[in-house]
């Protein structure tokens, strides 16, 4: 893929990077953006219990040493984004063994708490979360002039985050099976604003969708 990208001078976005080995070829390219996911930065293959299919995802979770290399690449900028890859499913689809179980992890509601705990434990400046989870994704989407920053002329898309709040009592997404243990990730979103309009506050959601087409 890297050779094709370089040959044609095209732009390439690598999604859900789980293997740090792949970075050796991507580092040589220009016009390449890379994302990874909270589960690749949290779990390690050595720690997954036998038959625990709630950890199955694609690409798979890899070894502890690989996880640390992903963190190093994220901090130095070789990986620019952290995205949820939220992929929930009914519990029945996770039954059976790893060969037949659904491959996906539900994490959308917990993503900020997970990453907040990681940067705190690793001594990373919290402002890096803004880069990885807001500013850089906005730039990739071609919206750096409108999204991803608190500045004049930008949409007032805001999250009111309380790092000292108790973990959520329940998950809001429909299919709640997840390998994460919510009680291990304190903090909660108190409110969310979209273009200045409050769409969420302490478990209550806006009654009508307020999304808009950003680019034709």
Residue ranges and their predicted role:
Residues 55-66, 102-106, 179-185:
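A short acidic, glycine-rich active-site loop
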Residues 12, 35, 85, 115, ...:
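Residue-level signal for inorganic ion chemistry
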Residues 97-100, 152-214:
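C-terminal cap of metal-dependent C-N hydrolases
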Residues 11-14, 56-62, 116-121, 141-142, ...:
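Short, well-ordered beta-strand elements within core beta-sheets of diverse protein domains
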Residues 1-82:
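Histidine/acidic residue-rich metal-binding segments in metalloenzymes
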Residues 21, 65, 132, 145, ...:
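Short, conserved clusters of charged catalytic residues that mark active-site
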Residues 4-9, 81-82, 87-164:
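His/Asp/Glu-enriched, well-ordered alpha-helical/loop segment
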Residues 48-56, 93-101, 173-176:
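Short glycine/proline- and charge-enriched loop/turn segments
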